[in-house]
């Protein structure tokens, strides 16, 4: 089972690598509570602070060291391929903490449906993907406080 989420709410400064806002910290705790019994064996993040901070409460609770999948040159497609390769090497159920432009693309790369990217205001969606040969089951779930209504062309 692979659970894919976007990082929690982030501050606007510093622009290059912001921390989570207080709302984001609460959402990260809500994620840890929601997944406490999900038998997560591997946590994958990017090298960006907001993804690591989102994963931290669950990682601490489970005693797991998150693995950062670097965002290399080559754009999002290269990163998505790297994440999928890391998922396939992982042990146990996997949590992937990504970004608005990668979450649904990772779902699709694992065999799920092609959805538009997440909206800038979408932080509380989780996608549970169960690859199973030719059949891939996907559940779209919500956790934490409700998000703002999505805009056009995004989830």
Tell what function each PLM region has.
Residues 1-91, 103-127, 131-155:
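Active-site-proximal alpha-helix that buttresses catalytic centers in soluble enzyme cores
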Residues 93-95:
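Acidic/histidine-rich alpha-helical segments that form the ligand environment
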Residues 97-99:
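Short beta-strand segments
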């Amino acid at each position: 089972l692979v659970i894919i989420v976007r990082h929690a709410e982030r501050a606007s400064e510093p622009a290059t690598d912001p921390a989570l806002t207080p709302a984001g910290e609460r959402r990260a705790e809500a994620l840890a509570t929601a997944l406490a019994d999900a038998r997560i064996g591997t946590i994958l993040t990017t090298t960006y602070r907001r993804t690591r901070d989102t994963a931290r409460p669950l990682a601490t609770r489970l005693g797991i060291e998150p693995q950062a999948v670097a965002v290399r040159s080559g754009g999002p497609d290269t990163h998505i391929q790297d994440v999928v390769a890391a998922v396939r090497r992982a042990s146990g159920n996997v949590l992937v903490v990504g970004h608005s432009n990668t979450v649904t693309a990772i779902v699709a790369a694992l065999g799920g449906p092609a959805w538009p990217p997440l909206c800038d205001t979408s932080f509380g969606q989780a996608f549970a993907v169960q690859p199973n040969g030719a059949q891939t089951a996907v559940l779209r779930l919500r956790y934490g406080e409700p998000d703002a209504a999505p805009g056009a062309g995004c989830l």
